[in-house]
Regions:
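Hydrophobic/aromatic-rich transmembrane helices and adjacent perimembrane loops
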Residues: 397, 402, 406-441
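Extracytoplasmic
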Residues: 2-8, 13, 27, 45-47, ...
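Transmembrane signal-anchor helices characteristic of membrane glycosylation enzymes that use polyprenol
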Residues: 13-52, 57-58, 64-70, 74, ...
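Loop-to-helix entry region of an early transmembrane alpha helix in multi-pass inner-membrane enzymes
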Residues: 80, 84-96, 105-128, 161-165, ...
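Membrane-interface helix-loop-helix junctions at transmembrane boundaries of multi-pass membrane enzymes
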Residues: 192, 235-241, 292-303, 367-398
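Membrane-embedded helix bundles of polyisoprenyl
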Residues: 29-33, 70-77, 118-136, 141-189, ...
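Start-transfer (signal-anchor) and selected internal transmembrane alpha helices
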Residues: 1-39, 50, 144, 280-310, ...
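Alpha-helical transmembrane segments at the extracellular/periplasmic loop-to-helix junctions
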Residues: 268-284, 300-381, 392-393
């Protein structure tokens, strides 16, 4: 084949023509997603939304004062008069990574401008990580397709545009990279590389946890994957040391951060990994003492028993988990809890995803993912021509199903649906494409079939990018939030920037400002003034008092 033509050699590696094609397509995916993510910059080079302003201020503190001071920092501009212990309740690795990146790559740019650009760059680099991850699951073609689909996946774009200096872009980068290293590690035959990848995967996945709490989602598919590993792989001696190594490194590394902290080990996340690891050993032992013909059967019976007991124990220990686990994460497991916490329910990004929103967000990915699920389940159809490892096949199904499930709780988590559908779609399309191009009929029909297939897939891929009017690309054509005052109106003014600048230059430096919590971070960062409440929502009682005050008459309010 032309693609296998050798171009040059670097050490023992033969650089072939198809490597150029892969690199070119990855550059295309990176460039495409970066341009789409950069659309808000045409209205003004500002941070998006609200939380990024606090994250900028925290990163600035590290750059100006160092890491040791950061971990001792009690932010006295927040939640007056108590302040806020920043390292204990914020995304530490986001601040550290951005600060280190600025020192290395910042050059002569201001830190503010650097943090505006940071999420778009990190989000765009994630197309390479998703390529590597899906390549491990389904091959190079699947990886390329995944990178192209991920580049335009709407929920991922929305929460990773230029100026979106929040936790999701970096959290996804670390989370998917850690997942890739883990899966690649348990596939690698060289023991030295296996240990290196597994240890690195555990540490980097913990970085993801310290960057974004939503990365706890990745624990669910990993835990379920560990449960079924002894049933789909026969190298039990390898599993007996590699899996505990990964779980131990991940939990210890995560526990070393103040958030999530040591409580992760015996919280819901830790148990979701520790119990499957114990099960792994027991299942291996059961299979070892079973007769050859009954090994898998007995292992499956034990798995069913453990799942039933696990569900029962979850119900029995619900009060324990409610004390050790954030309500938002419990809500992701049980979407029916949404309305029990009014403060959580009042936040727009915590609203339940509607059916219409799901179709807008994922549209064609649903069809491609359905194809992927069908192909994975009907493995015998393609078994003779395409090899898809059983363990990787199972993981693709697990992450696909679990991603769709947890996203049903919050609109914010819809990006996990996109990631799941991208993985399933890429695997399905890659296998189907290979099968189509292997069909040999008459020369004329052969060309017609292949051209028709390419046109059909291309049209289906392009439709959500251009139709309807509010499509996957145009959805990001909006001004940074500070230009619209946080409203949903399509406008761009400097009113808020002028107001905050006026506060900064015309009020005493020791002023204490009371506003609705949405605007706390803006006032602290752009006006350089202390606030009573802010977007961290650390004290629900204070927020309730402000709500009552704003909804009361002037006499009652005071």
């Amino acid at each position: 084949m032309v693609g296998q033509q050798k171009l040059f050699q670097i050490g023992d590696f033969n650089f072939k023509l198809y490597h150029i094609l892969v690199i070119g397509l990855l550059i295309l995916a990176f460039s495409t997603t970066f341009l789409i993510r950069s659309q808000p910059a045409q209205y003004g080079f500002e941070l998006m939304e609200f939380d990024p302003f606090f994250n900028f201020r925290a990163t600035e503190y590290i750059v100006e004062n160092g890491l040791s001071e950061y971990f001792e920092w009690n932010d006295d501009k927040s939640w007056y008069p108590h302040g806020r212990n920043v390292s204990s309740n914020s995304q530490v690795m986001l601040h550290i990574t951005a600060a280190i990146s600025y020192e290395i790559f910042g050059g002569n740019s201001s830190l503010y401008d650097f943090t505006i650009l940071f999420p778009a760059v990190i989000g765009s680099l994630t197309v390479i990580v998703i390529f590597a991850l899906v390549r491990v699951l389904g091959g190079t073609t699947a990886g390329i397709i995944a990178s192209l689909l991920f580049a335009v996946a709407l929920p991922v774009l929305i929460r990773g545009s230029i100026g979106w200096f929040k936790s999701e872009p970096l959290g996804l980068f670390y989370g998917l990279l850690g997942l890739y290293l883990f899966l690649s590690g348990i596939r690698t035959k060289d023991k030295k590389f296996t240990i290196l990848k597994i240890v690195s995967g555990g540490i980097i996945l913990s970085f993801g946890m310290a960057s974004w709490g939503g990365n706890q989602f990745f624990i669910l598919p990993v835990g379920l994957f560990i449960l079924v590993l002894p049933l789909v792989r026969k190298d039990h001696k390898f599993l007996a040391w590699s899996i505990p190594l990964f779980v131990t490194i991940f939990l210890l590394s995560s526990a070393s951060f103040e958030r999530p902290g040591p409580q992760i080990i015996f919280g819901l996340s830790g148990i979701a990994l520790l119990v499957p690891t114990v099960f792994l050993f027991v299942n291996i032992f059961i299979q070892k003492i079973s007769k050859e013909k009954n090994k898998i059967k007995n292992g499956k019976i034990f798995l069913i028993i453990v799942v039933i007991i696990g569900i029962f124990m979850l119900l029995m220990m619900s009060s324990y988990f409610s004390e050790t686990t954030s309500f938002r994460y419990l809500n992701a497991i049980n979407p029916l809890l949404t309305t029990l916490d009014p403060l959580t329910d009042s936040v727009s990004e915590h609203q339940t995803t509607s059916t219409s929103e799901s179709f807008i967000f994922n549209s064609i990915l649903m069809i491609f993912a359905g194809l992927g699920v069908w192909i994975i389940f009907t493995k015998n159809v393609f078994q003779s021509k395409i090899i898809l490892r059983n363990d990787m096949r199972v993981f693709a199904l697990i992450i696909g199903i679990s991603g769709v499930y947890v996203s049903s709780a919050f609109l914010r988590l819809e990006l996990f649906t996109s990631i799941s559908l991208v993985i399933l779609s890429a695997i399905g399309l890659s296998i189907l494409t290979k099968e189509i191009f292997k069909i040999k009929v008459s020369k004329k029909k052969n060309y017609s079939l292949k051209i028709s297939y390419v046109l059909l897939i291309s049209i289906l891929f392009i439709i959500p990018l251009v139709y309807p009017e509010n499509n996957w690309i145009s959805t990001l054509d909006y001004a940074p939030t500070v230009f619209s005052g946080g409203t949903s109106y399509v406008l761009s003014t400097n009113d808020w920037l002028v107001t905050l600048d006026w506060i900064k230059n015309n009020t005493p430096e020791d002023s204490i400002i009371g506003s609705w919590w949405d605007y706390g971070y803006w006032i602290q960062t752009l006006a350089d003034r202390t606030t009573l409440i802010d977007n961290a929502t650390l004290n629900g009682n204070m927020i309730e008092k402000f709500a009552a005050m704003f909804l009361s008459t002037p006499d009652d309010a005071f």
